[in-house]
Each structure stands twice: as C-alpha cells, then as structure tokens.
C-alpha cells in the first residue's frame, strides 16, 4: 500500500505533463492559414466523458428467432472406432528432409529357415571398398553419467549478494547416518524431585514353572526369522496307507496333512565361488546441474561400428509376384525346433488291437522318498489380525537399548563470537578446469614439433557403438549371399507359375544359432489364404525333447504355496535402514546413584540483608513430586552399540515409484496365443514329404478326442504272471477324420519335477530397501530371543526399612533466595568457563574525554576515495629512444584494389587481321542514336513523272508491324443493325469460373410485413418438363422478396434460348491472369466479322504479370461457350488505334552520386575516469588471460617532440584486397586494335522480360493529311515526378569545321550575355578534392534557456552503503528470536601457499599474445556510403546571400548521357574552309518538287549559300492543365517483400527509403521474437545468419556462441538436400524495400479464392495470399496482424521461410517449420463442423484465402 500511495502523485504529475506537451504540440501543428488553405494535421483528441443516460425507449415488438447458438463444449472422447479399411496408395511425396539418425534397433527375431537352394557358382573375392566419406558430426549425445566429484576449487571472491527471503520449508530428508559421538554436554539443570522409583532388581531366576495353557494369538507382528536349527533325527516310518487299486504298478495314496516343521538344519558346506553378480543399482541421481551452453560442433569422429539392425518396419504393401529366383546354396540344417503349441484334436481312431492281458498284484507300493522341496511360493496375502493375547509374565530386565533416531534439528542458535584467525589451510587440490574462454585471435602457424615417443598401448574400454557412417563406395560384386528371409506372399494376379526347380542336395550341418526371445502371444491373425488340400499326409514322428526355452514373462501371482524345506543358512546381510521408532517402553528400574556433580554456578544474590543462620540437619527424603514438563530436547548422544533388531513395523503406505530396477531374468514361456481365424483352403500342390524333424518336446496335452470303439476284451493273464507286458507296436495311422471344431485350450499340465538347487551365489551388495513384503508362513521356532519389554509396573509394595545411606546425590536445583543475614565473603572461586556472547547492549552515555592513548596499530586499508580533479596537462617529454622492433603483425586482411594507373601511351596501330568468317545474323539491335548530319548533297534534277505500273503479285501477309503513331480519333459510326441470330453452337467445354461481377444495385426496400407464423416446409416439386424457349418480355417491377423455398430436384436441360442482344461493354474486372487452359478441340471457322467501332478508354487496370501476348478483344457478354475455331487467315493490318492512356511512370532513376561530405563535428568531451578498485593480494601467476576490452581514451597530452626514427619492423603479411579505388583520369585514346576472329554462334537466348520503351524511331514518311476533328479530352494522367532540368541548348547550325587554331591569349572579361535557356540538370560530378580546413567561425548566439523537464520518477532503492563508524556498546537486550542469515563476511586473509599439486594435464592452446606495437598508418579507406538525408531546414524565407567566390575546379565528371538536341541557335560566323570531309551517307530522297515554269536553259550555276533561317512560328494552342503535384507526405511507411532475389520496386508515386532482406523473426534463449512483415523493422539492410548478440548482467556479451536462430522469408529456390552455407545462402533469402506511402495502408482478406475489393476511397497496391502465422523450432514463432500489409504475401508457398542457425552459419528447411494461412470459408459452411481434408501439391492454393493491400486515396487532399 505504501508503494501505491507513493505512486499516486507521480502518476498525476506524469499525466499533467503529458497533457501540457500535447497542448503545445497541438498549438504548434497548425500554422497561419489565412492566406492560403493549409493542411493541418491535428492529433486525435482523447475520448470525452460519457453523456447522461437517456430516457428508456419503448418496448419493441418481438423479434425473429435468433441464429443458431455457438457450438457446445467439446464432447468427451469417443470410444476407439474399428480400424478403417486400407486406403488407396497415395501419390509419391516430395523428397523429405533428411531425418535424424534413428536409435539402434533391438535384435530381430531369427527368421524361419529358408528352403535349401541349388548350389551357386563360387564368386571371386571382392576387394575392400574405399573408406566412406567421413560423416558429419552427429548431434550432441545424451548427457553422460555424473562424473566423480571434482576437487575443491580456490576460494571465490565474495559476491555482493543481498539477503534473500527465507525459502519455503524443505521436505524432510532421509534419516542420516548416526553421527560421531559429540562432546559431553554441560551439566543440565538439576531435575525436580522424581517420582517414587520402581521395585529393585529382580532376584535370581527361579525354577521353571509348568507350561501354561497356550494363550490367545498375540497382536504383535511376526518377528524376524530365526537362525536355522540343528538337523532333526529321521522320524519313524509312517503307518501303511490304505489300499487302493489303480491300474498299474505303484499306487499313489491321498496326500497327507502337512507334517510338523522339522528342526533347523545344519549349515551346509561352503559352495563354490558363484559367477560374478550383476552390476549394482545406479546411484541416486545427482542434483541437476546448471544448464550448460551448447558446445560447438566437435570434429568429425571416426567411423563407428555398424549399428545393430533396426526394428522391423511396418509391413509394406503387398507386392506383385516376383520372378522365380535362382536356386540358393543348400541351407544349413536348422536347429532343433522349440516345442510346438498343442495340436488340434486328431480324428477319431479305429478300434485298436486287443490289449495285453491285464492283471497285477494288488499290494500297495512302498511310499516313495520325499520329493525335493518345491520352489518357494509367492508371498500370500496378509492374514487377518489375531485376537489380542493375555499379558505375559514380566521378563527380565533388558539390556540397554540402542540410541534412538536423531531428533529434529533444534532452533538455530545465536551467532557465536568471532573466532581467532585460523592457521593456514593445507594446500587444496588443483581446481577443475574453468570453462573455455572465448576463442582468441588466430595465432601464426607454429613450427612442426618434434616427433613424440611412441605411446603405450593400454587397451581402453570398448567404446559405444558409433552412429553409422556414410555409405562407402560400392565394392566389387561379392559372392552370392545366403538366401534371404522369405518375403510375404505376392499377389498371384499377374505372374505365371514357374517351372518346378530341381531338388537341391542337403547342406552340411550349420552352427547353432542363438535362441530367439519368445515374443508375447500375438493377436489373432487375419484370415489366411486358402491352403492346399493334403490328401495323404502322415503325422510326423514325435521329436526329441528340446532344449529348455528362455524364461517367459513373469506369470500372474500364484496361489499360496506350501511351506518349503528350510534353506541353508545365508550369510549375515548388511545392516538394514533403521526401522521406525518403537513405542516408548515402560519405565525401567531406578539406576544407582551417580557420582557427586561439579559445584554449581554461583547463585543470584538475594535482596534481603539477613545474616545466615547455623546450618540445619539434613532433611528426610521427600516423596516423589509430580512429573515435570518435558524438557527441551538434548543434544544427540554418542552412537550406542547396535541394538537387537526391532519388531517389524506395520506395513507402510505405498511409497513413490522407485528408480527402475535392473532388468530381470527372462521370464518363462508365455501361454500360447489364441488360435487365429480359420484360414481358407489354399490352392497349392502337395509338397514332397519332409525329412523327419528332430525330436521335439511333448506339446501340451490336447483335449481328449472322441473315444474310439471299444476294443475286444483281452485274454485273461495266467494267475502267476503279474508283470505287465511291453507295449505293442503302434497301429497304422487311421484315415483322417473330419475336421473337428477348435477345442477350448487344454488345462495346464502337471507341475514338473523341481530342479536341483543351484549353488549358493556370492553375497550380493545390499539393495535398496524394497517395499515391505507380505507376511510369510510362521517360521520354525527360533532360539530364545532377547529379553522382552519390561512389563507394566507392579502394585506398589509395602514401605521398606530404612536403607543404608547412599552415595551423596547430585546437586539439587538452585534454591529460592534465603532470608538470612549476609555471610562472610567467601574465598575466590575458580575461574568459570567462558560464557556465550551476549547480545549487543544499548548505547551507554558518553564517557568523559580520556587521556591520549598510545599510537594504534596500522589500520586496514581504506576504501578508494572519489576520483580527483583532472590535473593540468604535463609538459612535453623529452624525445624517447628508439623502441625495439615490434613483433611481426598478423597477416593483414587483403588490401583494397589500388587506383588505376596512368593510361599508357597509345600503341602503334596493328596490322589488319584476316577477314573473319561471316557471322550468324544477330538479333535485332536497339535503335542507335541519330548519326551526325552529313553534308547536304547537291540537289538532283527533278525527274519526269513515270507511267503507272501494273499491279504486283499480292505479297505474303507480313508480320505484325510495330504500333504506329497514334492517329486522330475517327468519327463515331452509326450503330449497326442487329444481325440475324445464328444457329446455336454445340455446347463447349465448361469454362473456368468467371471473374466476380459488380454488385447489382439495391432494390427498393419492401414494406415490412407483420410477423407471420412459421409455415411448414413444402415438399420438393416433381421434375418439370422442359419449356419452350422464352422470348424477352418487358421488365416487370421488382416484387417483394419472398421466403426462399426448398430446393427442388434438378430439372432437365431446356432448349437453348434465342441468343440475346449484344450487351454493353462491361467494366473491366480486377484479377490476375489465370492459368492458361488446355487447348480445346478446333472449332468450325467463323465468318469474318465487320470491324467494330473503337471503344471508349477504360480505367487503368492493375499491372498484371506479363502474360502471353494476346489479341485485344472487346469484352462481350458471355455467350454460350463455343469450341475453339480453326485458325483464320491472317487479316490485313488494321488501322491505327486510338491513342491510349498515358503509361505508368517509369522506374525511378539510379541513385545519385554520394553527396559532399558533411562538416566535421566538434570533438565530444571525454568521460570521467572510473573509480580505481582495491588492490588485491598478490596471487599466484594465473593462466594467460583473455585480451581485455579497450580502455577509455585518455585526455589528449601535449604534443611531444619528434622522436628518432625506429628500426624498421618486420614486414607484415599480405593484406586483404581493398575497396575499389576511384576512377583515374581519362587516358589518351588508344589506336584502333586489330580485328578479332569471329566467335562461334551463341545458343538461342531465353525470351527476355519486356524491355523498357525504346527511343523513338526515325520519323517515317509523311502521311496523308488526316481529318482534324478534335477528339474527346482524355482523363488526366497520374501525377508525374518532377523532371530533371533540361540541357543547355545547342548552338545553331554547325559551320564547317576549320583547322584547329592555336590557343589564343585570354581575352578581357566581356559583359554578361543574355541568359540562355536553362540547361538540363547534369549528373552529379565526382567528389571534388577536399578543400583546406576553413577558419573557425564566430561563436553563435547563446540559445534560450530550455523548458524545465518533467519531474523524474522515483529512483530505485540504492545498494547497501559503506559501513559506518562503530557505535557505543548498548544495554544488553532481551534474547531475540533467531535472525535471518547474515550477509557474507569479509574476505579472509590468504592462507599460506600450498605444496605443489599433481601436474595437470596439458592445457589447451593459450590465447593470442598481447597485441604488438602499432603498425604504420594504413591507407585511407574508401568513402563510406551516402548518409541518410538530413532533416528539412526551417521554412522561414531567408534573404539570399551575396554571390560567393568561384570554387576550385572539380575533378572531371563522369561522362554524361547524351542530351536531347537543343534549339537552333543563331548562325555562327563563317569559319575558314575545312578540310574535305569523308563522304557522308546518302540522304533520304526528297519529296518531289512542284513542277516549275519552264525556264530558259541556262548554264548550271553553282549552288547558292544557305538561306537565313525562317522566323519563329505562331504560338501553339495552350496545353491541357497539368496534373496535381506530389502529395504532402505524412510519413506513412510501407514494406514490400518480393519473395525473390530481386529488390522489389515501390508502387507508383512512392519513394523508396531503403532496401534489404526480409527478416521474419529471431529466436534466442529458447524464446522467439516476431517481426510484423508490414513494418519497416522486417527489412534489414544487411543479412547475417546471426543478426543479434546477447548480453547478461555481468557486462558480458556473447555473439554466435549458442544455439540462436534467425528466420527469413525465402524465395522459390528448390529445397536443398543439406543445409547451405555462406554464398550458397543468398539465392534463398527474399529481398524487400521500404517505401514512403502518401497515406495509410491496410490489408483486406476475402476468405475465399476471389480477390477482395478495396473499400470505397481506397486503391489497390497488390494482391496476394493471406499469411497468418508461422512456427519453427521448439514450437516458437509468431504471426501477422490481419490488418497489416505483412499478412498479404504476393506468392503462396507451403514453406515461405527458411531457418538459419547463427553459430553454424548455415540455413535449411527443417521438418518442424509450419506456415499457417487463412482458409476459404463458403457461405453455407460458416457454423458447421469443418471437414478434414488433405491437399496434395498442385491443389494447395484452392483452400487459401486471397487478399489485397489497399492505400487510402489522396485525390481530394491539397
């Protein structure tokens, strides 16, 4: 609340200050507008206060039912549906980005042995393949296991931490190990008088009493298992069991009751040493370490071992049947198979032969030996609690119990007194290497070292399997491999069955393969193909017993087993964790008196001053007092001896899940899976009978088959023969019976014989305590246990006699102060122990001034003082000696290219070369500049008019000529009569959707009707008959809108109607040119139409992409679509068309030359020097430090005297190439070189983009005079940019050139001539030579005082101040509660130096050395880029100054462009006759002159002199009014992204501010920051994969050292397979331009595939696709505001941006980049559930919304 109260006034002041500023700004924005209208841009005012509440309106009529409500919350997840059918095979996808390497797969199951193939030919041994290219470094591995704890590092500097808030109470830790015995505590305070003691020690043990009757079961838990007892004697044989007849030899009697448990067996002999046990459990996971920075990529590792085969992939689509393969080598014989699943029931057998004679003795067999003990059963469920037993007799006194669990930690004590300075510590172990520093500058290449000694080859641990390397080069053809695993059966649709192969020879015995792991029972398989019918298949013989299988998965918990035989005595286990604390025992007997205690502390003096009386007699012992309050917990006592194990506690609650245990041994075989569905019978031929397999294990017993017919009774055996006969031979196999229905699974078989007990293993390590097991069966009675807990106290006995006096007791508690007289002073006591430090007391009153003391010891070093004032600059020092030559500098970067040399002397003219071969006709060149006028030829004599020639042969139709000059518009012709309607054409192919028409006019609003009741929906009508073609009726009045009816079924197509009249020309629609459709079938050629009248000029369309050159038609009304006609005969060249609209303005010119360099600013003031730090203790020499940052520049010293020349330094390394130098002076023109040989003809170039408009051609022949009817005035053109000034006019007709005269002497200065026509503005000249520095100007007028600033906000709390002077000691206060932890103490004194540590490993290469002495001054750099234009100066009118002196002549400028010919000047004086010129080109033939009167035939005269030029013509008609000038710029900024490598042009009439590269967003510290593509910040002038760095609170900044990323709009360059680096990146980065727009811009989105219109009063800039959002790595990203032009990209890409990794300097399209676009939404699907849809390449744009970027029109603004 205090903070809020304090912020209130500050906020009010800030608001008042802002209001004042806004008022001043609003006053300053409008200027004096009295004389001329001015455009005032006021800021928008703040929102007014709400008005008063109006009166309530009248109640409206009931409204129509509302629209459908919002969708309800998402329902619960439905049950999983059945798997859908397999889809059709999709199109082939695009090439994916390379995936990350997969994990190593597990071992696959061994495949089934293939059939033996025919032996192949022995192949040659292939040569070893070349090693593969080393793989790229793999991604960083998983974090390793925590390493061993490092050695202690050096003591760190004290941090400037502040006391943090107390943290939350932590969870209780695990009980600690018992501590070492602590020192004896101080004597406690004497206790109060105790209760009366219990009875004394028990007497000697009496004779044993008779056994009592068994008590009720006790409540206690089952005690620990006792040691095994001695081996009992063998009991007598039991009585014979009852006789019971079974059919064969021995008779098994019923199972007897379990006998009593035998005595404890003797310990067995020590077993052999067991196999080493499994590794122990992993240790507790360490505390999570600080997150390390991502390391740089390591060097490429060596090629790893081949990885294990991966997991089997999902089954592919079923392939076609392949060709028959070659026969394989005979396979190795397979292993003995595992036991099969139980077979189905066989068919019912025939009657067997008569059995052997029965009989046998009917005596019971002798009881068999006892079986081996069964495996211990799983622990049974806990039994119910027994009834409580009667209390037993009191046991003997128990031994002293062990120490209890350590108590909870006590409250924190007061801080102890400051200890003395400790001795120097033992030197610490060498610290852990610190983190690697920033890589230093590269040092010079070192000399090669000496060859090292050969290393010792201690074998290391085998490394982990590496990632698979890149594939090696293919080796030569290897030998034929073993037959592969049998593939899935192919389709038998296409292939023909192959011929049966020959049977191969049996192969040799193979090696035993590893047993595969049994899988879990599979799900029922799908129904198989129909199998072949087997007509005479005999069942196979029973195989031998197989090897034992692997253990299956652990089965479910079995029923509780019988108790097993006692096992051998195990070794004593490690001590378990301490059990929970037991219940408190009954009080023990009183102990013996202790020894007398130490004398107590001196008591407090009493207030009374009475004399002590004589000592009294000792009093009688009092009765036991009431028990006192429990005392404070004492300190933990010393660790006592280990007590007897306590009783097991109650089972605790379920603990948290433990760490994962080690993998258990493989379980036993699982149960067989359920049988699959019955397959259909197959079609194959029966195969050859197989060889008999190895003997398998007996399968599980199947269900009994149907009983056979009863056999014939056997003959009775003779009386004396009782032995059973051997079994007979098996009968012939019976005929197969009908297939029985699948039986239920058989019962589990009998429990097998228990195996032999294994050898006892070695003692394992103690495991973590497991969860408490279920209670086992009661064990064998153990030996006598320890004494029980003492019983409840007995009844108090009669009072005994007075005993002998005991030893003197402990001191009693301090008595209450007596009332006696004070005694004599006692003798001085022994010095007491040092007491605890008291709390600081309150300050005392100041004492009197003491005498002057001795001088004190020197004080600690004080803190640094404030920096002193700057001293006066020192006098110049003497000239120093020459320094030593510096260390050779590093290799410099390449220098800039030098300036051009002076031009060489022109060489001699070479001899003419041989004439070249005629070249191929070149492409049509651009029109050349007009040539120099030739000398006028003599006029020829006029010819006679010739005879009219015959008509020539009609020529081939020529190519379409270039457009002629625009003619005058013709008269409008009369409107033609409508033609006869033609026959209806055949219906054409359906065309593409047309452009959207303009919206129709709104109809008259109907009268609102009364609200009717809702009617029922009508039924759809039946399909109607097709009506006749309707004729046009008169247009009726618009009816009222009706309710929409139900949609009827589609009727049949009607007859084609009469074609309508030709509609008026529609307005041109907006839109981009569509994709060209497929070429239709050729149509019937149409008749040639009459030439139509010229149309009126249309409005300017948006600039489209350059389309194919089409014929321009007039937009007609859509007729019935016809087929394409056959190409017509080329028509004659048409008349010149009407003049078009003025064209778009041309592209802005090239940037001008750099401007004059600005005036050099004053040098800024130097900053104050920083506070010097404390001087630390001298440390040991540290490792080589990193280069420091450059220090602040010092104050300038006075100039020193010139020093002696130093010795020359070592030559520097070659520098980097410099920037290009300025152009040299123009050289003397060289002589004409020899002609070269003609080159080979080049390939035909691609058609270029449409070029800019060429220069005007030469004037054509004069046309026939046209009719001069004035055409309509065209619409005003777009505003043009201000033109450049024209060039100065050329002088008049050129006289003949005279001989070059000698230069004359300079004449006198003539009078100023008349001003000439203004010349065109010349190009900027090259930079002039920099002038000398001018004299300093006069100081300016001091400025006015500034306005007072806004009061600042309250500053943040400052840091802790320096410690103050120590105060006076205070009065001791009361004992406070434990305080917060204090600040860290001051740094302690340095210890003595330690002994030298173990030599460390070789350190990394040190950083670069200190920089050498400064090198010589470099050459001046090239001019920097042109700075941004400065701000506009004030608008005040300033009187022009006087004309300045002429400047120095500038360097010669670049050659200007050829100017337009100027106006004719007056004729010059005749020069002397020139040398005869070369013959000029023939002139164009003159027009035929008029026939003159016939003159006298005179001699031909010489040609006369040129006449005077004619007078000026009459002035022309006034021109059309000019367009409005450029609009007032409001500073709106627009950004345009080209999504190509071309820099985009700004829209017409807009000025480009800069261009650059399109930045989408950046990511750092796992967070991203988005750029709005419509804002100027998204167009960076320079590109880098890492355009930013990051800084932390330690004043350290890091660049390109972590996994930071940048994302840029990309081009349509094809996606690369691997990341691109350096110059390869440039083709993928989009370019952009920032333009200044005349008004605000917005983006409009249609959410359809139609281009939206701009709002009224806005005009279009470009159209595009609606880009909404993007995400990249870590699901970070951003989005575009839909109103920003950045949300409307001109081109759609599924991947419109690329990710660049800053530290690696590479860019790539990764698979986790997603772009999000607004989609199309139909009107009828606005509130429906969207249907899932996947669009393949080629159809992507069909669901992406279109958009248009619009700018506010500024036509009305002045």
Curated annotation (Swiss-Prot):
Q: Provide the GO biological process annotations.
A: cellular component organization; embryo development ending in birth or egg hatching; gonad morphogenesis; protein localization; regulation of distal tip cell migration
Q: What is the lineage of its organism?
A: Eukaryota, Metazoa, Ecdysozoa, Nematoda, Chromadorea
* Gene Ontology MF term list: extracellular matrix structural constituent; extracellular matrix structural constituent conferring tensile strength
Q: Where is this region: 7S domain?
A: 27-42
Location of the protein in the cell: Secreted, Extracellular space, Extracellular matrix, Basement membrane
Underlying gene: let-2
Position of the signal peptide: 1-26
Q: What is this protein called?
A: Collagen alpha-2(IV) chain
Q: What is the effect of changing residue 588 to R?
A: In MN103 and MN151; 96% lethal
Region annotated Triple-helical region sits at 42-1527
Q: Summarize the PTM comment.
A: Prolines at the third position of the tripeptide repeating unit (G-X-Y) are hydroxylated in some or all of the chains.
S-S pairs: 1546-1635, 1579-1632, 1591-1597, 1654-1750, 1688-1747, 1700-1707
Report the source organism: Caenorhabditis elegans
Q: Where is the composition biased (Gly residues)?
A: 102-111, 268-283, 398-407, 693-702, 737-746, 782-791, 859-868, 958-967, 988-997, 1194-1203, 1251-1260, 1373-1382, 1492-1501, 1507-1516
Q: Which UniProt keywords apply?
A: Basement membrane, Collagen, Disulfide bond, Extracellular matrix, Glycoprotein, Hydroxylation, Proteoglycan, Repeat, Secreted, Signal
Where is composition skewed (Low complexity) in this entry? 47-62, 224-234, 408-417, 429-439, 495-509, 568-584, 839-858, 929-938, 968-980, 1040-1056, 1237-1250, 1413-1425, 1433-1454
Record remark: domains? Alpha chains of type IV collagen have a non-collagenous domain (NC1) at their C-terminus, frequent interruptions of the G-X-Y repeats in the long central triple-helical domain (which may cause flexibility in the triple helix), and a short N-terminal triple-helical 7S domain.
Give the Basic and acidic residues compositional bias ranges.
Answer: 189-198, 258-267, 464-479
